[in-house]
């Protein structure tokens, strides 16, 4: 299924000249004669649109991946944005670049981005660099019995020790989780225009939807479709998942898609807690309608509580990746050819989540348990209801299984 993007209205922000900060800032000569900046990045290496760290020249100017991807999407799709403030003077910096698409595109052009340089064909992107230094040190305390199989009898004393094998296996598994997470975000056009997948902003940035602008149903359906596509793409890019029999891959994806979608929606701050699709229906005297009202109210309340718990814990990207793996690898799923392998992957995911939580949140000894307790709440709203609410308008009567299979094959 190919969905066409819908240009979303920007949030209302206080009008301010985007160049005011740059005009008022006086640069002082730096060690390399390039001037210094409070961000610690040389001005010549900053994104000329938002001031974030530049990843090189894009379409004629130094720009970050976020702004270059936004410009490419806008030009290729001939998107037309409207500044809701109306003045066309919204601030465009690292903190506010996602708030007004019209002003962001305007600043891209003013900064010198060349529309003619945007190629019609899809250009390959360089493989993202994954930093795993911290994970290397975290494997020191990893329980080998859960991470690596026992060494066979008669192993040469010069061969790898069980502990070194455990470290290598654990390191590889965590690397594959994060690489899959990165690959699912490499092409910004696979995600909604208002979800900056290359951003280094906090885990829960300001939602692209605000209470001052309507949370349009078309926008929610569009974003939902893209989040589901990202979830499928994440699974496809997970080497340990691809190593399973193809039938097992399909069965696991059909079983877990709704949980993967909800995790992605929470991670990228889709406003599920205020989504009009989840608003309880109007009360009715009929008993059946009253029952549906009660169920819808319960689902909405549980979802709001779940989102609040995720935000209270400030779940980080690595934890999200591990939690996605936990909901994907369910050995109890019926029809699996190799449930033992799936169970081993589930154990790996749990060990990685535990070790990461202990290493990065040592002051929260119960954090791992709290993260695990979040997962059952994702299944409170059934997959059938999520399909009805978020995807029925987009896919019509097409079975979700067929949609997932098409996404997976393509």
From Swiss-Prot:
- Sorted UniProt keywords: Disease variant, DNA-binding, Isopeptide bond, Metal-binding, Nucleus, Receptor, Repressor, Retinitis pigmentosa, Sensory transduction, Transcription, Transcription regulation, Ubl conjugation, Vision, Zinc, Zinc-finger
Q: Which InterPro entries match?
A: NHR-like_dom_sf, Nucl_hrmn_rcpt_lig-bd, Nuclear_hormone_rcpt_NR2, Nuclear_hrmn_rcpt, Retinoid-X_rcpt/HNF4, Znf_hrmn_rcpt, Znf_NHR/GATA
Phenotypic consequence of residue 407 to K: In ESCS; impairs protein folding and stability
Which segments constitute the NR LBD domain?
Answer: 169-410
Matching SUPFAM superfamilies, A to Z? Glucocorticoid receptor-like (DNA-binding domain), Nuclear receptor ligand-binding domain
According to UniProt, the tissues expressing it are described as:
Eye specific; found solely in the outer nuclear layer of the adult neurosensory retina, where the nuclei of cone and rod photoreceptors reside.
Select a single GO molecular function from the record's annotations and give it: RNA polymerase II cis-regulatory region sequence-specific DNA binding
| Tree of life domain | Eukaryota
One matching Pfam family is Hormone_recep
Question: Per the record, what is the consequence of mutating residue 309 to G?
Answer: In ESCS; impairs protein folding and stability
Listed CDD domains:
NR_DBD_PNR (cd06970), NR_LBD_Tlx_PNR_like (cd06950)
Main localization category:
nucleus
Report residue spans for region: Disordered: 118-162, 193-215
Q: Which residues bind DNA?
A: 44-120
As for PTM, the annotation reads: Di- and tri-sumoylated in developing retina. PIAS3-mediated sumoylation promotes repression of cone-specific gene expression and activation of rod-specific genes. Sumoylation on Lys-185 appears to be the main site.
What family is it from?
Belongs to the nuclear hormone receptor family. NR2 subfamily.
Assembly with partners or alone: Homodimer. Interacts with PIAS3; the interaction sumoylates NR2E3 and promotes repression of cone-specific gene transcription and activation of rod-specific genes. Component of a complex that includes NR2E3, NRL, CRX and NR1D1. Interacts with NR1D1. Interacts (via the DNA-binding domain) with CRX (via its DNA binding domain); the interaction represses S- and M-cone opsin expression. Interacts with SAMD7.
From the Swiss-Prot or TrEMBL record, give the protein name.
Photoreceptor-specific nuclear receptor
């Amino acid at each position: 299924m190919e969905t066409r993007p819908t240009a979303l209205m920007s949030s209302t922000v206080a009008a301010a000249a985007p160049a005011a900060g740059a005009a008022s800032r006086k640069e002082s000569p730096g060690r390399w004669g390039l001037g210094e900046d409070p961000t610690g990045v040389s001005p010549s290496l900053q994104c000329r649109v938002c001031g974030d760290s530049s990843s090189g020249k894009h379409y004629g100017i130094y720009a970050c991946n976020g702004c270059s991807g936004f410009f490419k999407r806008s030009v290729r799709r001939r998107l037309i944005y409207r500044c809701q403030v109306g003045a066309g003077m919204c601030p465009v910096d690292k903190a506010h670049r996602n708030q007004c698409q019209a002003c962001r595109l305007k600043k891209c052009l003013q900064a010198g981005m060349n529309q003619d340089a945007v190629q019609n064909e899809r250009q390959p992107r360089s493989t993202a660099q994954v930093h795993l230094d911290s994970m290397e040190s975290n494997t020191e305390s990893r329980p080998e019995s859960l991470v690596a199989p026992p060494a066979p009898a008669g192993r040469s004393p010069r061969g790898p020790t069980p502990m070194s094998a455990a470290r290598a296996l654990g390191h590889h598994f965590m690397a594959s989780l994060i690489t899959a997470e990165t690959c699912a975000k490499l092409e910004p056009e696979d995600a909604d225009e208002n979800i900056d997948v290359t951003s280094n902003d906090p885990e829960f940035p300001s939602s692209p939807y605000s209470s001052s602008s309507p949370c349009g149903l078309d926008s929610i359906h569009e974003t939902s479709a893209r989040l589901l596509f990202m979830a499928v793409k994440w699974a496809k890019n997970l080497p340990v998942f691809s190593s399973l029999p193809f039938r097992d891959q399909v069965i696991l994806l059909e079983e877990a898609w709704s949980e993967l979608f909800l995790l992605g929606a929470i991670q990228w701050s889709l406003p599920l807690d205020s989504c009009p699709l989840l608003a309880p229906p109007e009360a009715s005297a009929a008993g059946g309608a009253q029952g549906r009202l009660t169920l819808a109210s319960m689902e909405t309340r549980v979802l709001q509580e779940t989102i609040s718990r995720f935000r209270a814990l400030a779940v980080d990207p690595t934890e999200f990746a591990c939690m996605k793996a936990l909901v994907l690898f369910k050995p109890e799923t019926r029809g699996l050819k190799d449930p033992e392998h799936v169970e081993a992957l589930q154990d790996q995911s749990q060990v990685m989540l535990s070790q990461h939580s202990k290493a990065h949140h040592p002051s929260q000894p119960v954090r791992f348990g709290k993260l695990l307790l979040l997962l059952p709440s994702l299944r409170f709203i059934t997959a059938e209801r999520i399909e009805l609410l978020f995807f029925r308008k987009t896919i019509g009567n097409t079975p979700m299984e067929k949609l997932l299979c098409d996404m997976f094959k393509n």
